[in-house]
Amino acid sequence: MVDRRNLLKAGLVAGILPLGSLASAARAAEPLQIHRAVYDSRFATGRAFAAEAQARGWTTAAIEGDVTQLWYHQLNLRWREGPAPIAGVTQENSLFVLERLAWDAGMRVTTRAALPHEPLVSWLIAPPARRIRA
């Protein structure tokens, strides 16, 4: 059930991700397209994030802590073609695994924020900003 508390937390999460997206997009000089919005469906905050992501037109992917199926059936296939940014609200251990897998696709965690009073973090995995030489 989505109550006022979880709705406010989802707003906080939704507010965090665009800042990272805008900063990355400004550095890359092109809009950042989110390939997947990953959320842990065991948590109301994760489900609220998924609803917000769907409202933005993002494709969502639910997990229950384990990212194996997501990796094997979706991300691995797409990341073989090249980088595809993903955003999410998961537990830290799920992010840890996704972060390591993203390295092989040339991506890094570019935004990470712990959610207050939750065992969750919001994050963005995307290609790192291009370095500008002076």
PLM features per residue range, with description:
Residues 1-15:
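N-terminal secretory signal peptides and thylakoid transit peptides that target proteins
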Residues 19-24:
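C-terminal segment of classical bacterial N-terminal signal peptides
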